[in-house]
From Swiss-Prot:
Keyword Transmembrane helix in annotation: yes
Primary location class: membrane
Location(s), subcellular: Cell membrane
One Gene Ontology cellular component annotation held by this UniProt entry: plasma membrane
Gene: Gr64b
Transmembrane regions listed in the UniProt entry: 48-68, 80-100, 131-151, 184-204, 266-286, 291-311, 371-391
Heme listed as a keyword: no
Family designation: Belongs to the insect chemoreceptor superfamily. Gustatory receptor (GR) family. Gr5a subfamily.
Keyword annotations: Cell membrane, Glycoprotein, Membrane, Receptor, Transducer, Transmembrane, Transmembrane helix
Pfam families recorded: Trehalose_recp
Name of the protein in question: Gustatory receptor for sugar taste 64b
Amino acid sequence: MPQGETFHRAVSNVLFISQIYGLLPVSNVRALDVADIRFRWCSPRILYSLLIGILNLSEFGAVINYVIKVTINFHTSSTLSLYIVCLLEHLFFWRLAIQWPRIMRTWHGVEQLFLRVPYRFYGEYRIKRRIYIVFTIVMSSALVEHCLLLGNSFHLSNMERTQCKINVTYFESIYKWERPHLYMILPYHFWMLPILEWVNQTIAYPRSFTDCFIMCIGIGLAARFHQLYRRIAAVHRKVMPAVFWTEVREHYLALKRLVHLLDAAIAPLVLLAFGNNMSFICFQLFNSFKNIGVDFLVMLAFWYSLGFAVVRTLLTIFVASSINDYERKIVTALRDVPSRAWSIEVQRFSEQLGNDTTALSGSGFFYLTRSLVLAMGTTIITYELMISDVINQGSIRQKTQYCREY
């Protein structure tokens, strides 16, 4: 690992891209020195993020108005939840931005322990490359999903226009299909479409980026636990002096405090992200028993969106759970310490390792460990069995009519 490969330098470009969508409005996010990172209430980034928040909040108000005037059903409630989740994600990233300068300075201080001898010999984790790979894969897949859903909307709006003989232009039909809540209060103008698409992206981007951000945090923390484990594994079954175990234990406690600091800061984001992912997966599974459509594009967009949500959730768990995985490896390594080398320091270290779970959590409701996969899988299978029993599959027919009532 290069001597200067800190988490801040590895993740700075990713955070800069997120600021394009109004997330984490921190000044000097790409600064070489963490001391230069600032959160200023009167800054262009804050004003830009505030503008995006106002636009999203205004559209949320239009959605509420639409739901009240039309009806509350399964579909409109999912639209409401989408905007609520989006607004909460922006709010939680604002909350995190206020704490981010302090977090980065604390993180940088802990990292200095692992950027010098002997840890530099155990540093092939390559934080930056891993973060870039995760970000590229997740956000590229999210872009494909967004394009498929847009293409799906274009197709369905055109089918509605032609089948139902609606006397509107092609682009107005898209506006009517994509934004029925705005169509009720704002007449169509072509110049509105690029603005609405940009607002749409600021709503869609945080859903995937939040998972990506959690993975980036997990990679940064796991890299240091990996170094600590490698140092302990290097002295496997060797007799080491007490000063060695004292130093290793103190470094572990520094990492543990850092995990607790990060967990307190991003726990609301973790809870929101996994709650949203689970509800979306269950919603799509429910829709899979209902009318999806006979068109290839409709089917492709539906199943890709569902598959992407499942894979993204699993990837987030596996990446973030690597923190806990390395701690468990350290526990295993301590069990192999020879009895003649066992000391008070090793005993204290062993007890501190077993005190509690070292992992990111969703505000204490769950921890990002590998066992979470089994828990979520069991929940989804139970839900699938329940709805398959409730819904009469014999009455399901493929959707061939696209006319909607407003």
